[in-house]
Design a protein with these regions (language model features):
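Conserved AMP-binding/adenylate-forming core of the ANL superfamily
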Residues: 2, 22-76, 93-98, 148-156, ...
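Structural core segment of the AMP-binding/adenylate-forming
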Residues: 10-11, 53, 80-155, 538, ...
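Conserved pre-ATP/AMP-binding loop-to-beta segment of ANL
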Residues: 18-21, 135, 157-184, 191, ...
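Conserved AMP-binding A3 loop
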Residues: 33-37, 173, 180-206
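ANL superfamily adenylate-forming
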Residues: 115-176, 283-336
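Conserved AMP-binding/adenylation subdomain of ANL enzymes
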Residues: 203-224, 228-334, 344
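Conserved ATP-binding/catalytic segment of the ANL
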Residues: 399-467, 484
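Conserved C-terminal "lid"/linker of ANL adenylate-forming enzymes
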Residues: 490, 536, 540-597
Length: 597
């Protein structure tokens, strides 16, 4: 297929593959297929409907919605017109929604559910540029006063009867360097910045990433679960997977992933490390409850898997007897884990945050491949990914074709390529700070590049902890070690300009609860539980194990356990489940200060 714009990609993909199940959508308890033809017609009718409303090339439309099939149809319709899609996370509060709509000067707002529509009602007076409010679901709340998506579709259907080729004509006028989207970063400080990405940015990233990944075919099925407002899943599910002819099943939600994995039995899936961390924690939790004999069997299998995996990493044939042992380990232990992810998974792709190498290696030993990659919103997003034959745990792999990386004198990762954004919307100062005149983009990440091109991310440049003694500590690798522990769900390392490193730890409450019950401890008061001497002693023993492998200046000297998980709703996590470090440090300042008093 030849394509230079997202429109060319879309039409070529739909007409080349002609799938009966381009999408799979869960409805009333069963999965309903959406064919390529139905997808084409829905996108066409919406495009012409938006056109009838007066939306034209270069206008901005805000899309406030969770993942759903309509997200695909609306995004495609907007691209056909050359209209800029401004996606907004459904988890954002009304105040932040207002800022994005106002800053982008959106001409229309599409809101999915009643709760999303209510946000637009509460901020409507501030949205002077908005001419159309459009609801995906009905009934709409009081005060919404707008159209429904069905209304827009009806307008387009009528227009298609009189001008059946108009959508093709409009789509052909969109150029590769035209703006496709403005994605507002879920920044942890200040107002978010609007990242401007073109059709060419996305198309180059689709082509480069497809070359870097194992071959994908029309027989593949992907389970799609990360928010479409995030560039990682947008690139994968909306552009890359369709280009390859992959069937895309839209997960019902993050909490339904285990159930959907069993139903869909995907062959590929993209997600953030939190999924793999939780899967790993559940496995260890189940093992902890097993009989001594089952525990011995499990750890024997893991040992065999690691030895067998070391040969596979080097593309070498394992010895015959090791192969035999691995078959036994798979039959008795690993098969159950493989079945939990559907039983036919070829590989996961991990992005949006760092993945602990211990977790990637564990799944590799069990016959489940996780390809860790790296990218940012500003790079459309993929910069690098581990090759299927040549995985190196702890690295994010090698750059994809046409993308360059170099390390600046201060260790910052710089990148250049056709995937790099054109700039930040209406923010020349931030654009000049991030983009050099010769095209090099400052990622804000610190890393190391090996002689054969494997990139290792050390940390965010701004997150590096400098102790009072002048020692530099990169928190992410240490935090990843903590999160690989079965009793620890989340951790934030602190210690900037302090004498030593300390940590705020969120326990894995499910695992901790089982242990506490076995010790006769009450679970009614979580604050009392995390302060109980037995619990403190248990977690301290886990910290001591982690500290044993750290340099003296990196050792975590003090720990405080938190009584609740970090959540998106409380503003502590981004929509891709990354911790907002500054929010945590501000919220728990008294607790942090106590560790140094």
């Amino acid at each position: 297929m030849q394509y230079e714009t997202l429109n060319q990609l879309f039409f070529a993909a739909m007409e080349t593959h002609r799938k009966p199940d381009a999408l799979l959508v869960k409805s009333e308890g069963s999965w309903r297929p959406v064919s390529s033809q139905e997808f084409l017609e829905k996108a066409r009718n919406l495009a012409l409907g938006f056109h009838e409303l007066g939306l034209k090339h270069g206008d901005r439309v805000a899309l406030l919605s969770e993942n759903r099939a309509e997200w695909f149809f609306i995004d495609t319709a907007l691209q056909i017109l050359g209209v800029v899609n401004v996606p907004i996370y459904s988890t954002l509060p009304a105040q932040q929604v207002s800022y994005i709509i106002r800053n982008s000067e959106s001409k229309a707002v599409v809101a999915s559910t009643a709760s999303q529509q209510e946000k637009t009602v509460s901020i409507r007076a501030d949205l002077s540029t908005v001419e159309h409010f459009i609801a995906i679901e009905t009934p709409t709340p009081s005060g919404f006063e707008g159209l429904t998506l069905d209304d827009v579709t009806s307008l387009g259907t009528k227009k298609a009867e009189s001008e059946p080729d108009l959508h093709r004509e409009l789509a052909s006028k969109v150029r590769p360097d035209d703006l496709a989207t403005i994605i507002y970063t879920s920044g942890t400080t200040g107002d978010p910045k609007g990242v401007m990405l073109t059709h060419s940015n996305f198309v180059s990233n689709v082509k480069g990433t497809l070359q870097a990944l194992p071959p994908l075919t029309t027989a593949d099925v992907a389970l799609s679960a990360l928010p479409y407002a995030h560039v990682f899943e947008r690139l994968a599910a909306h552009y890359l997977f369709p280009a390859a002819g992959i069937t895309i099943a839209i997960a019902e939600g993050v909490d339904k992933i285990p159930e959907n994995l069993a139903e869909i039995r995907p062959t590929v899936m993209t997600f953030a490390p939190r999924l793999y961390e939780k899967m790993h924690a559940r496995v260890l939790e189940n093992v902890s409850q097993a009989s001594p004999a089952r525990k011995r069997l499990f750890w024997w299998a893991v040992g065999v898997g690691r030895e067998h995996g070391s040969y596979r990493l080097k593309s070498e044939a394992p010895p015959t007897f090791l192969n035999l042992k691995y078959k036994v380990a798979t039959a008795l232990v690993f098969k159950k884990l493989q079945q939990r992810v559907g039983g036919r998974l070829r590989f996961f792709v991990s992005g949006a945050a760092p993945l602990a190498p211990e977790i990637a290696e564990f799944f590799w030993s069990a016959g489940i491949t996780i390809l860790e990659g790296y990218g940012l919103t500003e790079t459309s997003p993929v910069i690098a990914v581990n090759p299927y034959k040549g995985i190196r745990f702890g690295t994010v792999g090698q750059t994809i074709p046409e993308v360059e990386v170099k390390i600046a004198e201060d260790g910052e990762i710089l990148t250049r390529g056709p995937n790099v954004m054109t700039g930040y919307y209406k923010n020349e100062v931030a654009t000049r700070e991030a983009l050099e005149e010769d095209g090099w983009f400052h990622t804000g990440d610190v890393g190391v590049l090996s002689s054969d091109g494997y990139l290792t991310i050390t940390d965010r440049k701004k997150d590096i902890i400098v102790t009072a003694g002048g020692k530099n500590i990169a928190p992410q690798p240490i935090e990843n070690r903590f999160k690989a522990n079965a009793y620890i769900a989340e951790v934030v390392l602190v210690g900037n300009q302090r004498r030593f490193a300390s940590a705020l730890v969120v326990p894995d409450f499910e695992r901790l609860g089982l242990w506490a019950e076995s010790q006769g401890l009450s679970l009614e008061d979580m604050q009392a539980l995390v302060e109980h001497p037995k619990v403190v002693e248990l977690l301290q023993s886990q910290v001591d194990e982690i500290n044993a492998d750290l340099a003296q200046f990196e050792k975590v000297k003090k720990v405080r356990l938190l009584a609740k998980e970090f959540t998106i709703d409380d503003g502590e996590l981004t929509p891709t489940l990354k911790v907002k470090r500054n929010v945590i440090e501000t919220r728990y300042k008294k607790l942090i200060d106590q560790m140094y008093s």
